[in-house]
Amino acid sequence: IVVAPCSPFSVSRDLMREAAVLARQYGVSLHTHLAENVNDIAYSREKFGMTPAEYAEDLGWVGHDVWHAHCVQLDQHGIELFARTGTGVAHCPCSNMRLASGIAPVRKMRDHGVPVGLGVDGSASNDGASMIGEVRQALLLQRVGFGPDAMTAREALEIATLGGAKVLNRNDIGALAPGMVADFVAFDLGHVAYAGGHHDPLAALVFCTPTQVHTSVINGRVVVKDGQLATVDLPRVLERHNQLAHQLVSGA
């Protein structure tokens, strides 16, 4: 359970402050979108006389129980603030590219100790919603923005697993270890996409064409088996989904 106004710029200052109080009364986390693009920076400076990160601090929206999506335009002061307070960031590289928001300074964030996880930002700005595809994109985008040494395959995968767990303030997920929640996925390395990459399966998984998972287990429950969803009647769901999508775009 998370208290999550969409953006601090779409609701009142009082609502943001009261949301922070409410979340901490119930011991749940806070989430919103912040510093996504240059327009956010300009609006925040004009409206509040401060950067989005400074505004978040003023509202009580920093701390280990808070994570912000994007933070593409987070400046040095904002990075240091988030590192000092343990405020997390959900990096959404595909969304940032689709909306031309820019390249989030993930390398600098991590070097300063900011908790960084990985997100897809929902279907409105990411039609694929592939987490392994997002891992690949995070790595490539950091490299194109900050150089070939900006991120390794292992680090990109770490952001998506251990990084996400830290951002969510969870110590029971993100790794395979005794006492942890039984969350894991399995990929078929016999797939043609990974041909020639078996000497380094981790790099192959991140760099090669993203494939669907062979098996997915969430909290001990098998959700995907042999590449197929095991929890729903997928053909029926897809048929209904396509009907509703057609009605929506046609105005029927």
Residue ranges and their predicted role:
Residues 1-88, 100-116:
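Histidine/acidic residue-rich metal-binding segments in metalloenzymes
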Residues 21-28, 61, 137-144, 166-170, ...:
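Generic secondary-structure signature for well-ordered alpha-helical cores
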Residues 34, 93, 188-190:
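Nucleotide-sugar donor-binding loop of glycosyltransferases
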Residues 58-65, 107-191, 206-210:
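His/Asp/Glu-enriched, well-ordered alpha-helical/loop segment
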Residues 99-103, 127-129, 197:
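Short, charged, surface-exposed secondary-structure boundary motifs
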